[in-house]
Amino acid sequence: MKNRSNENPYFTRLQNMEKTRRWLLEQRARKAVEALKKNAFDALYVTGLESARAEILNRIPEGAKVGVGGSMTIRQLGVLDTLEKQGHVIYDHWRPGLPEGDILKIRKAHLTCDVFLTSTNAVTLEGELVNTDGIGNRAGAMIFGPGRVIVVAGVNKVVDDRESAFRRIKEIATPQVVRDMGLELPCAVTGFCVDCNSPMRACRVAVILERKPFLSDIHVLIVGEDLGF
């Protein structure tokens, strides 16, 4: 058998390229975690999905009513089925076939649930959570109301600062989210934000959590995987 490393002088470096990339993302994530802690958030870095699931389940008390924000990240983790099997009431407004009136009730229930599960659009290296919403139930529930908030973000959502956070939201997250939702918006067609004034514009509420709000119990898990939009 031929030794491929003899054929290509960069073979080893090419093999290590993804490992090196992951190392850098982990360093950035860990720096963000330390900054979040300084800003009074409970924050933790975990390496993968299995560890993230375990941390989430360990932080949800027995019998807790659990609200779920509009988050692909939370669905990727696969914890909702487990929580239902454990007997938790789940407030999930993404359940197929829900009447519009029920969806509104569930969104309101997010504000008073025992535990609210969500992601965030961006986490800065300065320890801030940056979000843009269309309705505001997700951003609102992150700030005040639930007994506990668990925020989960992949390393792909770690950015340098607020400016980078909003640029990520406008240029990366929102075009994908609205296209996935099937909304007829300019960014869903072109992939670029034009700061539209469409009746269905998704960017209507912008919230920055600079520090953990008083009376709120917020846990932030940064996962060493690409998650969500």
Predicted regions: what is each one?
Residues 14-18, 37-40, 88-91, 102-104, ...:
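N-terminal start-of-chain detector that recognizes signal peptides
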Residues 111-229:
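Conserved phosphate- and dinucleotide-binding cores of soluble alpha/beta proteins
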Residues 19-20, 94-96, 149-156:
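Flexible, glycine/proline-enriched loop segments at strand-loop-helix junctions
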Residues 2-42:
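Generic N-terminal amphipathic, Lys/Arg-enriched alpha-helix
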Residues 10-11, 60, 145-146:
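Catalytic cofactor-binding cores of redox enzymes
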Residues 14-28, 103-113, 174-177, 207:
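Charged, low-complexity, helix-prone segments enriched in Lys/Glu/Asp/Gln
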Residues 1, 25-32, 77-78, 84-89, ...:
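Unusually extended, aromatic-enriched hydrophobic runs near protein termini
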Residues 25-107, 112-117:
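N-terminal active-site beta-alpha-beta segment that forms phosphate/nucleotide-binding
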